[in-house]
């Protein structure tokens, strides 16, 4: 089952109290969205190649035939005991609390809604337009992912509250049709995109993201992400929390011309081997780290037993392998991804073969720095510049 492009956990968090910070004569806000762990009631199936296919198609990359075939065959694993929690983000949308996936790789706020049939909506919290909501006549939205999961529907202007900060009016994309893959994941009720508004998919006119709507209310027009492995993390809006990282932040300029948080890393290191620059996107909505073929080959060339497995839809490694760290150089800063994060998940429950957390970007032309990378870093998404700040997590 594939939910957006994030599978192992539904990354998000529990909105907590927003602290209003006076700045001059105006009141500005900062707030933190804390992730909240929720026990999984039963083992959860994960379509590993489907997850990979979704990440590729999200950016318009061709999905290799072997990956597509593996995704359609439904290769799955059950959630290991060590990973038996999910992290959910309650967000107030039009007066209803929904669990949304925060995604820096997209710019839509779409939700399960009362427009869905009972068979599509059972087990989900549903958006019901508030009494002050306005339906945008003639407006629509539609998304399709690499595993053929899809959703579409109508557009409303309504209010959205995260951490006590209210976006109003905010475009809310209400699902009126949804595929079975989304229906099956009872824990997630939609997505809150945090990329640039220029890539919002609403037709005939794109709409602004939640962040763009509220950034004028924030103490600083930024948010910072601390994702964790097997533990709750946070999203900080309007401020940088110096207690969450060590040393100093290193900034990289962002090229937002394509609507993404795109930056260029100066190089990479794998053990004693090093390589050149990598252009990529910081994406909390993608689980894997997708890199150019030569970098992927460099990495798995140092792992005994690693192989490109067409039946699995990607590179696999022995689950018992001690994988090397992968280091991304940004200026003078070395962002280290521990090898333990790259040994991602067993192909099947009890399998001794694991799916690799680093996979090919399939000739996409840029890399995707997903959660495998982000879980090792404190990352600041700063609209001023724009720029990205990186530091090791405390």
Curated annotation (Swiss-Prot):
Q: Which residues form a coiled coil?
A: none
Sorted alphabetically, which Gene3D superfamilies does this protein's record hold?
Acid Proteases (2.40.70.10)
Keywords (A to Z) from UniProt: Aspartyl protease, Disulfide bond, Glycoprotein, Hydrolase, Protease, Secreted, Signal, Zymogen
- Intracellular or extracellular location(s): Secreted
Annotated Peptidase A1 domain ranges read: 87-391
Q: Which reaction does it catalyse?
A: Hydrolysis of proteins with broad specificity similar to that of pepsin A, preferring hydrophobic residues at P1 and P1', but also cleaving 20-Gly-|-Glu-21 in the B chain of insulin. Clots milk, and activates trypsinogen
Q: Where is the signal peptide?
A: 1-20
Q: What is its main location?
A: secreted
Q: Which cysteines are joined by disulfide bonds?
A: 319-354
Its family?
Belongs to the peptidase A1 family.
Q: How does it assemble?
A: Monomer.
Q: What does this protein do?
A: Secreted aspartic endopeptidase that allows assimilation of proteinaceous substrates. The scissile peptide bond is attacked by a nucleophilic water molecule activated by two aspartic residues in the active site. Shows a broad primary substrate specificity. Favors hydrophobic residues at the P1 and P1' positions, but can also activate trypsinogen and hydrolyze the B chain of insulin between positions 'Gly-20' and 'Glu-21'.
Name under which the protein is recorded: Penicillopepsin-2
